[in-house]
């Protein structure tokens, strides 16, 4: 009978306990509101809200309304946002090796990308986690191609044009200097205006990105030569994520990881359709005119990779690991 008052007290406490306050994760992205990226993210957010019984909710700010990557990171630091879908260039200030797959002309095709990513994605995600970022996946934008207002199919042509690189991206600067090109840095949000005003004449961008960001409206030519692999990351401030209970964390990781994998699959399926769409818009496809011109691009890629490694943009150790995977994959084909 002595235990009865304790049992009654426990029941009363349970009855009047205040439920855990919902955690709303405010996420910024440059992706347009009507993009497949946003559709999949919203579907994932709805599933998470249901499975966590409202304890975890997402609110998205698409279309760059929160500013460029630098502005978004500042807002995360000031707790105005809890996370973002960011280009890997924006995350290099925390972990430089996150741009490993950006090394120019490292991959010949998507099968090679998949072989290396299967081995090293966990390493890159762990590196960001150590710097305070929870990563739900690395989302593929695809191979970037040079698109320009004036025709250009050789490195010499590119060196005469005003070529864009992302602002405050040391890795991109080292890479393009390896090709012997002097770039014009701009934020992604300013690229369309830069093309319209002739501040820049050429960009390197995946076809799906050129369509989504409307850059295709200001270019006339595409060099059909994949220059680098482009991807981003869906990240959340680890301090915020750690406030969720373990079960809710597992749900968020599962759902958003799955959705981001689907984004990569959709972007890859859309790759051919995007090329066709660019052609239908009147963009002319170019190719290196001869073997010597192609060899010059390949050598430029090698020099650009070396420059990125020498500058510390990517560690030699991780590059060698990626290269070992590539060589093993190629030898097995």
Predicted regions and their residues:
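Positively charged n-region of N-terminal signal peptides that target proteins for export
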Residues: 1-5
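N-terminal secretory/targeting leader peptides
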Residues: 23-112, 128-333
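Sec/Tat signal peptide C-region and signal peptidase I cleavage site
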Residues: 16-22
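Signature of the catalytic double-stranded beta-helix
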Residues: 114-126
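Bacterial N-terminal signal peptides
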Residues: 6-16
């Amino acid at each position: 009978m002595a235990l009865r008052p304790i049992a009654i007290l426990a029941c009363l406490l349970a009855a009047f306990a205040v439920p855990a306050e919902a955690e709303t994760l405010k996420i910024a992205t440059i992706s347009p509101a009507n993009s497949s990226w946003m559709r999949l993210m919203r579907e994932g957010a709805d599933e998470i809200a249901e499975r966590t019984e409202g304890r975890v909710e997402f609110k998205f700010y698409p279309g760059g309304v929160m500013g460029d990557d630098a502005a978004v990171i500042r807002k995360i630091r000031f707790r105005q946002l809890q996370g973002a879908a960011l280009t890997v260039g924006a995350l290099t200030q925390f972990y430089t090796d996150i741009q490993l797959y950006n090394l120019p002309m490292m991959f010949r095709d998507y099968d090679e990308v998949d072989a290396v990513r299967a081995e090293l994605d966990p390493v890159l995600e762990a590196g960001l986690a150590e710097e305070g970022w929870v990563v739900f996946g690395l989302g593929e934008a695809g191979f970037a191609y040079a698109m320009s207002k004036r025709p250009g199919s050789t490195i010499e042509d590119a060196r005469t044009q005003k070529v864009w690189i992302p602002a405050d991206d040391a890795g991109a600067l080292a890479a393009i200097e390896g090709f012997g090109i002097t770039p014009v840095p701009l934020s992604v949000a300013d690229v369309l205006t830069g093309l319209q005003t002739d501040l820049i004449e050429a960009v390197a961008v995946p076809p799906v990105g050129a369509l989504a960001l409307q850059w295709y409206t200001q270019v006339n030519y595409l060099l059909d030569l994949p220059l680098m692999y482009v991807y981003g990351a869906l990240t959340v401030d680890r301090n915020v994520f750690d406030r969720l209970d373990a079960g809710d964390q597992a749900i968020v990781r599962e759902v958003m990881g799955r959705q981001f994998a689907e984004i990569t699959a959709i972007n890859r399926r859309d790759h051919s359709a995007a090329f066709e769409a660019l052609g239908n818009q009147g963009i002319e496809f170019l190719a290196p005119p001869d073997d010597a011109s192609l060899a010059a691009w390949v050598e430029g890629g090698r020099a650009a990779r070396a420059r990125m490694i020498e500058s510390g943009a990517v560690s030699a150790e991780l590059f060698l690991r990626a290269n070992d995977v590539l060589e093993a994959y190629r030898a097995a084909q």
